[in-house]
Structures are given as structure tokens and as C-alpha cells.
Amino acid sequence: MNGKIVQIIGPVIDVEFKGADLPKIYDALKVDELDLTLEVQQQVGDNVVRAIAMGSSDGLKRGMAVSNTGEAISVPVGKPTLGRIFDVLGNPIDNAGPVESEEKMTIHRPAPAFDELAASQELLETGVKVIDLICPFAKGGKVGLFGGAGVGKTVNMMELIRNIAIEHSGYSVFAGVGERTREGNDFYYEMEESGVLDKVALVYGQMNEPPGNRLRVALTGLTMAEYFRDEGRDILFFVDNIYRYTLAGTEVSALLGRMPSAVGYQPTLSQEMGQIQERITSTKTGSITSIQAVYVPADDLTDPAPATTFAHLDATVVLNRSIAETGIYPAIDPLDSTSRQLDPLVVGSEHYDTARGVQETLQRYKELKDIIAILGMDELSEEDRSLVARARKMQRFFSQPYFVAKVFTGEDGRYVPLKETLRGFKMIISGELDDIPEQAFMYAGDIDEVLEKAKKYKD
């Protein structure tokens, strides 16, 4: 079934199909002369469909022949995808030959039915102190890493992948949505070096790609993850960055002539976000644990894009620029970050009480900061002074050397088990470590390392 191009406006292509059945919404069309795929978005009348190009529209001209494939974009799935890099159409882009995959699946699929869903209470240990204590992850849950430009979303994401993918021996899928090509390259070699590349499928649609690619690349990665889940596996699904998915949707929406809504976003923002997020879920067959980086424009968490994402997550890890400015990394805010798992019935009363004790101390310190700035420490009561000292130790103990940052810091990373994290913070809260200098807590792993550092300072 052939049609011809009648209008080209950037990545938006109008195709006329005379006297034939019109392609369905989301059908893939092929411009054979240029090997370009288009995806149908609208039927505009007079036998014309409006499609978005999944690649550059350079070289297209009116009158070119277009064929209808009769189905949505399909991508390879299953074990042959592991260790390979794909583009949005499922073509390998790592110069390692074709993918020998028997099976292909369309990227547009319905979310699992309500009665197929399964909730999990099992915790997923990450080895990062602040996350395991304050906003623990659930196996099969959804986590968002929120942060502005340059506060460490990608580094935190890479550290979590390294820690979880190495400790958890299952398969992972990584979708690079609208991020820098350099980061994708670094990530590939990082995976290769740590020996987990043969368990990861990578799908990239970088910043330089047209909006159609960036809008659909997350669905390509998700389709690969869903296939593994439906085989009965526990899958890790990483998205960096879900905001770029929203942004690509905004661009496509404007190109298709829809009226923008708040702050210029597409009117279908929450529906598009819901469509992808409802598919990232765990069923009775298998689980998808998803970690998504979310860029926060101008550090404003009330912006419609991050605000819409919040509603879908089980845990939110909020990165704070003011913490990064004090030189404490990871710059995760223990007062802003939340998790549904931080419940005494899930994590146990010891963990819950320790986490809340830490948050209370830090909150009180935050309230006292204004008084300290105006009057100085001397005006505080003895009790408040010791509370401030403990809070500062907690802030520094939250810092931690990362494995993936070794190239920058020259220091080996630390994986801190949850029980060690709890032991350390309980000792700080109880006042056992009041005589240890606060610099000993900076970039230490567990509490034993802090005590060793303190000994060196004394000597």
C-alpha cells in the first residue's frame, strides 16, 4: 500500500494515500528511497496522514513514494539484545554486526491489567548510605532521581547501576533519552570494565536526534524490559533522562499544531507520562525495578514536568545544589527525599526510628541556622550546641566515595551494607561519637573507617 509525500515541515511529514485504506495511528511508514521510518500521529482528512520522522528529514522531497508497513515500530527482544546498543528502531549502532533475534515486539503496548499487578515489600539494598537509610528502594518499585543541571543525577545513576547490577545478577535495560552522547559512551565502557555488559541492553536516542526519536526511545527500551519481565525475570530498567522524554513530547506536540498548556508543555503531558509509567510495573510473572533520572528545570520542583513524574514514584531521591556547594557528595537531600518503604511495618522499627531521628536532628539544625548566622554558636543552649555538632557529623557521614567517581577523586568507592549504616547513625544520635572531630566523618565508608580516621587525627 503506497502513498506519496505532499508536505514537509521539519520532522513533520504529510503523506497522501489515494483510494487505499488509510494507515492506523502509530503505524510505521517507510520512505524506501532514504530508508527513513515515519510514525503516523494524525489523520488530517482528504486521505492524508501526518507523521513524525524517526530520523533526519534531510533529502526528503514532495512526491516521494512511501509504503505502509501495517504495524507499529517493532524492535528485537530477548537475550540477543544483551551487550548491544540500539537506536529507537531497534537497529544496532555499536558496529558489532546484526542482532540474531528471532522475536520482535511492537513498542506500543497496553499496560498490564489490574489483576496481573503484584506489589512487593522487599527492600533493594544499594550500598549508598543516605538512600538506604532515608529513602529505601523497593524491589519492583519505581524511583526518581530529581536534580537540576550538574548536581550529579547521572553519576548517582551510574553508581546505582554499578552497585545493583553487580550485586543483583539479573538483566538490566538502560534507555538513554535525549542525553549527551559522551555520557552514553562513558556508560558503555563503565559497564564493560565492571564486567556486566553482557547482562545489559542499551538503547540510545541522544540530544542531537530529532524529537520523534527522543519521544519513542524510552518505549523501545521499555519493550525490551517488558519481554524479560514476561519471561518471569526480575529486571532493572534505567532511564536517563525522563524529562527529555517530556521535552520531546512538547516539541512533537508543537510541531503537530496543538495548543500548549502550562509553561508551554503539551496539553497531553500527564496522559503521556501515565502511558509510559503504567507500563513500567511488576506483574505476578516478573518484576521491573525502575530508576529514572529527572532533570528539574531551574531547580524548580513545582515545574509541571517533574511535578507530573512525582505522582508515579515509590521513592524520590532529591539532589540539592546547596549540599553540592558545601562539597558533600552525593548531594542527596535527606529532608526532601521520601520513600513509601520507610514504614516500620516494612523496614522494621529500628530502621524507621533511626531515619526519623536523623531527620529530626537535621531539621532542628536547619531551624537553628538563622540564629547561628546572626548571634553565633555561643548564644545557643548546651543541648542545642551538641545537637548542631551531631547534625554536622550526620551531614558529613552521608558523604561517600563512589566507585564510578574514582577517575576524578582517585579514591576507591565504598559499598556500605544497611546494617553498618544503621549502626553508624545510631551511634551519632546516641552521642557515643561526640568527641570525634567532624572532619573524620567526611568521605568515609562505615563507622569503623571514621574511628580509624579520628585516630590518625589524634596522632
UniProtKB/Swiss-Prot annotation:
Keywords: ATP synthesis, ATP-binding, Cell inner membrane, Cell membrane, CF(1), Hydrogen ion transport, Ion transport, Membrane, Nucleotide-binding, Translocase, Transport
EC number: 7.1.2.2
Reaction catalysed by this enzyme: ATP + H2O + 4 H(+)(in) = ADP + phosphate + 5 H(+)(out)
GO molecular function, one term: proton-transporting ATP synthase activity, rotational mechanism
Superkingdom classification of source: Bacteria
GO cellular component terms, semicolon-separated: plasma membrane; proton-transporting ATP synthase complex
Annotated residues for binding of ATP: G147, G148, A149, G150, V151, G152, K153, T154
Topological type in the membrane: Peripheral membrane protein
The keyword Nucleotide-binding is annotated on this UniProt entry: yes
Compartment(s): Cell inner membrane
Signal sequence segment: none
Family designation: Belongs to the ATPase alpha/beta chains family.
NCBIfam families: atpD
Role noted for this protein: Produces ATP from ADP in the presence of a proton gradient across the membrane. The catalytic sites are hosted primarily by the beta subunits.
Protein name: ATP synthase subunit beta
UniProt organism field: Hydrogenovibrio crunogenus (strain DSM 25203 / XCL-2)
Gene designation: atpD
